[in-house]
Every structure is written in structure tokens, then in C-alpha cells.
A protein has these predicted regions:
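N-terminal secretory signal peptides that target proteins for export/translocation
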Residues: 1-4
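Signal peptide processing junction and immediate N-terminal pro/mature segment
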Residues: 20-25
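Bacterial N-terminal signal peptides
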Residues: 9-18
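Short beta-strand segments
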Residues: 121-123
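Active-site-proximal alpha-helix that buttresses catalytic centers in soluble enzyme cores
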Residues: 26-114, 127-129, 133-141, 146-156, ...
Length: 175
């Protein structure tokens, strides 16, 4: 199931998490999946622009009540920079994964971090593949100009996964 909504604050994300089905033996695994925020150029390892840094701070605000305990980003600087404000606030290390290995990332999350809340920073061409690798329906592709998507994937004890599609921060606009 994919639902879409605009996220105006951390309370909505916390509400989505609170509505996740509870399992007596183990909490559901919740994975927040975002694309890195705005970058300065199309270079292969471009860093974040001022707009991207501002959106990264907004992501920190929106996820403040989400109980995030694990951070994953690809090997690219912009994906890691997107999570730095959250890592600094929570005192967490950003775990690096291969951007081309969505299946490996999903396996690592489900094996090593079951029952936790995980935040993943990916790319326009990996975000929906990560959602699908976690067992949820694959959302439509993320456009290259689109930076405001936040996918909340909840995986229950039996492995059933659902996804809620939110937006955060200033709306992305098509060029």
C-alpha cells in the first residue's frame, strides 16, 4: 500500500510511526528513506548546496521525534551530508553502503536492525529500489529534480511491508 501526503512537521512522522502495527515480541522495523538533498552540481560526487544544507536541517527537524537509531548513506558525500545534522544531534555514526546494492542494504537492515527505526539517504535512482527491496510496493520513480520525498516503510513481524509516501520541507519544483 502506498499513501501520499505532505509532511509539515515531525509530529506527522511520529504519528505514522505510532500507527505502525505493534508486535508483542518485537517492534516493527521502520525505515525512513529519502533522497539526498539538493547538490551544487551534476558532478559524480557533488556536495550539498546551501539549499540542500537547509533541507538537511529540515529533515533533522521532521525526524526529531521518530526514534531513529541507525543511519545509512551511500558512499557519496551528498548522501552522507544529508544525514550529518541528524548524526550530530543523536551522536550516531553514519553507516556507509554501496549505492548500487539496494538488496544488500535491505538484507543488512532486516538482519542487523530488526525492530529499530532506520534512516537511509539514497539517490533519485536508488530510493524506490530500496523501498522495494524492503518488501514494500515500489513507488513511481523519483525525478532528478525531486528532493522532498520521504518514504516510511514499516515491516511487521511476519515480513509484511507497507509504505507511506510523504513530502517534507519546501516543495521541489520541476525546472
Amino acid at each position: 500500500m502506498i499513501r501520499s501526503s505532505r509532511c509539515w512537521g515531525g509530529l506527522f512522522v511520529a504519528g505514522v510511526l505510532a500507527g505502525a502495527p505493534e508486535a508483542p515480541a518485537q517492534e516493527p522495523t521502520t525505515v525512513l528513506v529519502v533522497r539526498h538533498t539538493e547538490k551544487v552540481s551534476e558532478a559524480s560526487d557533488a556536495v550539498l548546496s546551501d539549499l540542500g544544507l537547509a533541507r538537511a536541517i529540515e529533515l533533522q527537524r521532521v525526524t526529531a521525534e521518530a526514534r531513529v537509531s541507525v543511519l545509512f548513506a551511500s558512499q557519496y558525500a551528498r548522501a552522507q551530508q544529508t544525514l550529518e545534522p541528524i548524526a550530530d544531534r543523536l551522536g550516531l555514526e553514519i553507516l556507509v553502503h554501496d549505492a548500487a546494492d539496494s538488496d544488500g542494504l535491505a538484507k543488512r537492515i532486516l538482519t542487523d536492525h530488526a525492530g529499530e527505526v532506520i534512516l537511509v539517504s539514497g539517490h533519485s535512482n536508488t530510493v524506490t529500489a530500496i523501498v522495494a527491496a524492503l518488501g514494500a510496493p515500489q513507488p513511481p520513480p523519483v525525478e532528478d529534480w525531486d528532493y522532498d520525498d520521504l518514504f516510511v516503510v514499516t515491516i511487521g513481524r511476519g515480513g509484511d511491508a507497507r509504505v507511506v509516501h510523504l513530502s517534507y520541507g519546501a516543495p521541489s519544483t520541476e525546472p
